[in-house]
């Protein structure tokens, strides 16, 4: 490069921000000393296992059976080999195929891929996929309606995926009761797609979503984002006409883990098969008539036809998705139903307890909920969260961080690990704060 010293390499950095002295590093340490320092630094993190937690807003605290971790670390699965080459092992391919099968059964659609990065990228990919399939016959060319209650972090990803492709996003309005405005939804007929979430960002289940497909018609794709665990007790979107279903896979197989790694779910009807993103494993027979598994329709992908690929997804979440498949297999249909009922019961018990506090009210009292619910407080929700944190309780998510108009609203999330002791601690901490602000 023509440099004589290492300093020449950094000559374009302004003197005002260039560090010239040595780094403030300690001298050599023993392994024992390094471990002690590492533990001290890690102690600054908040461990969801160390205190009652009602934080959700996208990722869920969960219980992952020990068997999942044991199986996932076996050498047959945990390798440095990226599982998208055709010569990937039959065992890995079959495990991927089983994952697809379980996701397909879960959402009620015939086709699923081997995962996406997360729910947000899955939603964005579903929208672009729907536009590719529906735009030619759409009367509203390149238009997609998105629920006004999509969380801002997910909407941001959707906007990033669509803005360069000439896709116009319009808002699908909700009524003051939190439900989708079905009368207004008629305006979406003829668009490429409609994207809604069930439950929505407030944890509410909107029964009107089941009527959306009939309203928007067959020429417009219905995309539904789901809480995958809720499908143990809630009707599968494929039953009420969803064309594509996406969601966060994280509750199956892996904890929140500081935001990642996680994986997204993606399923669709056969109409979208050749335009869907990600890897697909197919089942066939070999020359001896034995079952064989293979990556199929790979020409959709960037490692085959970069200029014509349906998606640029590359780094793969397969190992994490297989952990989800292991978890789902261990649960089985009855276990999934019990898990969903347990979470629903915990949310209902927490809702009843919290709403018994004077000055606290439910945001939408007539809406059924799953996992999460939203309350209105007599003051700033962020202040309430800080107060409860000082009391040793992660009391939820202040929705003012997403929408300024909801600064007094608190999103409270529950899971299969929520206990009565946790609920009592939440009520005590929140009651203390309400008493202070109401004094």
State each model region's role:
Residues 4-17, 242-247:
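TRNA-binding/sensing appendages of the translation machinery
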Residues 13-98, 104:
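N-terminal entrance/gating region of PLP-dependent enzymes' catalytic architecture
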Residues 74-86, 104-109, 138-141, 162-169, ...:
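Gly-rich Lys/Arg/Thr-decorated short loops/hinges at beta-loop-alpha junctions or inter-strand turns
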Residues 84-88, 105-124:
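Short loop-beta-helix segment that forms the pyridoxal 5′-phosphate
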Residues 103, 123-130, 324-328:
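Buried hydrophobic packing segments
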Residues 121-292, 375-378, 382-390, 400, ...:
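Conserved PLP-enzyme active-site core in the AAT-like
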Residues 252-358, 363-366:
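Active-site C-terminal subdomain of aminotransferase-like
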Residues 334-425:
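Conserved C-terminal alpha-helix-loop-beta "cap" of PLP-dependent enzymes
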